[in-house]
């Protein structure tokens, strides 16, 4: 299971530490030859401290055998945990390869073209960049930290980004046509950002997927080859195909509808194109009405004075929950008011879905994969 010191320690241990001892592979030290390749991950050990471990910190005692995974599992990926505790998703090499091959076919990417990886390989989006490069017969260009100017000068043909990274490229007003393709995944992007990037020459492909589908399985609303998508009567998106995962590391049941994996996302299909509405477990119950937080986020993201936004529910004795908009202003000296945002929502959303509270912030707390950390946001309000 690939990991990073930026993973939250406690929820990460819940994923990687079922009964039995575990090991932590210090890949950087192993490759450079100046440290141990494998270190024990002890209960209570903080992930940030693991990176600082050296041979003198390891007592060398042999470890007893721990719990294993099925033979076909190539990697265990921790989900982002954007709305709750992360899960360990078991992926086979066949699933990873099926996803990467379908992606290359859809993009028309030729063998020998290079991929830039500036997403954490501990997340499925970053890992799949490496797999696509492998299938392309090239060595990936890897940037451990995101530097917009280095990204533009990387010489790579394709790159996978999250909206926050794309926003930083757009701020430079640089020529984005240097990439044959920019895959955009993670959190939903505000409509204005996509338009601004395309005006700068970006050839954008928006993606939908998750760890359980080996990454993006729907490009620009249409499923990849050999992937089937439908929406059930409950509004949840279902996915079938060779890209699906083998199960959860913890052994918890996989939500299924026959051969279909039932996601936690709500969506609608029109003309064979999928539109993602938001997460089913991110619904705000206010005054007896159900509000999909993702739908409100999408609308508010189109306001010209909003640079970034997240929508969460806050417990309220009168309404049960109230809709709270956490906004990063486009111009901090002239932030939008609650009245302006509610007026903007008036002809775009039902009245009960408009935010009742506004919190201004210089930046949203983000997870390593670029998604807003909604658990942390809820705790802050």
Where are these regions (language model features)?
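Conserved pre-ATP/AMP-binding loop-to-beta segment of ANL
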Residues: 12-14, 18-19, 61-78, 108-114
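ATP-dependent adenylate-forming carboxylate-activation enzymes
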Residues: 17-21, 38-53, 138-155, 188, ...
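AMP-binding/adenylate-forming
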Residues: 52-58, 90-169, 181, 205
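Conserved AMP-binding A3 loop
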Residues: 73-101
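Gly/Ser/Thr-rich phosphate-binding loop
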Residues: 169-223, 228-230
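Conserved ATP/PPi-binding loop(s) of AMP-dependent carboxylate-activating enzymes
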Residues: 223, 232-259, 279, 291
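AMP-binding/adenylate-forming catalytic core of the ANL superfamily
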Residues: 241, 264-353
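AMP-binding/adenylate-forming catalytic domain of the ANL superfamily
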Residues: 350-371
């Amino acid at each position: 299971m690939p990991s990073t010191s930026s993973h939250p320690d406690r929820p990460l241990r819940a994923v990687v530490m079922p009964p039995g001892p575990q090991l932590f592979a210090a890949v950087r030290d192993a490759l450079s030859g100046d440290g141990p390749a494998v270190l024990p991950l002890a209960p209570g050990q903080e992930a940030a401290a693991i990176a600082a471990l050296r041979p003198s910190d390891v007592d060398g005692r042999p470890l007893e055998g721990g719990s294993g995974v099925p033979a076909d599992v190539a990697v265990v990926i921790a989900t982002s945990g954007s709305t709750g505790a992360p899960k360990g998703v078991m992926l086979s090499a066949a699933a990873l390869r099926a996803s990467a091959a379908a992606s290359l076919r859809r993009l028309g990417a030729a063998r020998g073209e290079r991929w830039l990886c500036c997403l954490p390989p501990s997340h499925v989006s970053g890992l799949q960049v490496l797999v696509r490069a492998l299938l392309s017969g090239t060595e990936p260009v890897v940037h451990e930290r995101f530097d917009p100017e280095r990204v533009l000068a990387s010489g790579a043909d394709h790159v996978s980004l999250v909206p926050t990274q794309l926003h930083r490229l757009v701020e430079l007003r640089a020529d984005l046509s240097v990439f044959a393709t920019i895959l955009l995944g993670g959190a939903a992007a505000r409509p204005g950002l996509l338009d601004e990037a395309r005006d700068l020459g970006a050839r954008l492909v928006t993606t939908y997927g998750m760890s359980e589908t080996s990454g993006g399985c729907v490009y620009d609303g249409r499923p990849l080859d050999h992937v089937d998508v439908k929406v059930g009567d409950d509004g949840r998106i279902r996915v079938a195909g060779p890209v699906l995962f083998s199960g959860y590391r913890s052994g918890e049941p996989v939500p299924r509808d026959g051969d279909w994996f039932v996601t936690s996302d709500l969506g609608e299909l029109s003309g064979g194109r999928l539109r993602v509405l938001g997460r089913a477990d991110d619904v705000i119950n206010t005054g007896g009405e159900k509000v999909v937080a993702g739908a409100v986020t999408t609308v508010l993201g189109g306001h010209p004075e909003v640079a970034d936004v997240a929508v969460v529910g806050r417990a309220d004795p009168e309404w049960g929950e109230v809709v709270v908009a956490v906004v990063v202003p486009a111009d901090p000296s002239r932030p939008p008011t609650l009245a302006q945002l509610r007026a903007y929502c008036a002809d775009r959303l039902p009245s009960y879905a408009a935010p009742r509270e506004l919190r201004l912030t210089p930046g949203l707390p983000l997870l390593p994969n670029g998604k807003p950390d909604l658990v942390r946001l809820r705790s802050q309000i």
